[in-house]
Amino acid sequence: MKTLWAEISCEVPVAMVDLLSDFLVELSGNGVSIENLALDTFSLETVEDSPVKTVKAYFNGDSPLGSQLDAIETFLHAHGSAFAGFVFKHPVVATIKEEDWANNWKEYFKPVRIGSRLVIKPTWEEYAAGEGDIVLKLDPGMAFGTGAHPTTKMCLEVLEMIFYGEGPYNGDGKHLDPVTVLDVGTGSGVLSIAAAKLGAERITAIDIDADAVSVAEENLALNDALPLVAVSTTALQDVPGRYDIVLANILAEELVRLAPELVDRTAPGGYLVLSGILTEKEEFVINGFGGFGLSLIERRREAEWSCLGFRLESK
């Protein structure tokens, strides 16, 4: 017997998509999708095509949905007014078969180039690599990112620039010798995979979500990167040592809360790359990392998101 799922759809402004998606993932315990786009798998050119998107969450179709619908409507009323163009609409409920929910999102995940060299491709898509391409194979599952979201994309761009000494990162165009990398909030593992393929000699990847760790391990194995990466649910304060590059793609409030530990894990002269920051909270994060001996060397922005690149003073 095929499992039936209840699909609850909510129409919101583009800027509210991430906030609502996080809430729905927590409420449902499952992945979400966006109309005509799978979460975190869109082509970047489509972000501004429409002022609104339909976010869809999935619940067990055999259980009553009254409490979930009430929670969603309360959330929309509480947060919607903060977003330009928000008009409250009642969520729409539909019933779908499990195989439709599990596979339809894949048709929207295509190979995407990030930076000058990196190409991310799903495992089910063919891609003819060009000269100099560094191909990352990914099978993210519905609840984890693919690298196309601006927060992850900017991290990947900065990571490539660091390894190749481009822009504000050394600026000499020389490839770094093997380095150590700490990936905080690894999710699908895409940043760790990129670091391994760019030449890191040792990588530590952590995430508070055990499911994310499992997905990351599978993706690392797909890319023959698992021997280089220790991935676990270890808390940041329990990670030993210091790293040449520290990457943290998490919410602004968490970045500031973890600022002392993130700086403590950064080697003198090393780079600290922070993403997951709404542009309106950029100064909040910069101020939160003041007084630690960091130099802000780059502010990168895309859509409503910011990525900050710091260098820790050598001692």
Swiss-Prot record:
Keyword Cytoplasm in record: yes
Top-rank lineage group of the source organism: Bacteria
A biological-process GO annotation: methylation
Annotated positions binding S-adenosyl-L-methionine: 152, 185, 207, 249
EC number of the protein: 2.1.1.-
Recorded family membership: Belongs to the methyltransferase superfamily. PrmA family.
This protein's name: Ribosomal protein L11 methyltransferase
Organism the protein comes from: Geotalea uraniireducens (strain Rf4)
Name of the gene this protein is made from: prmA
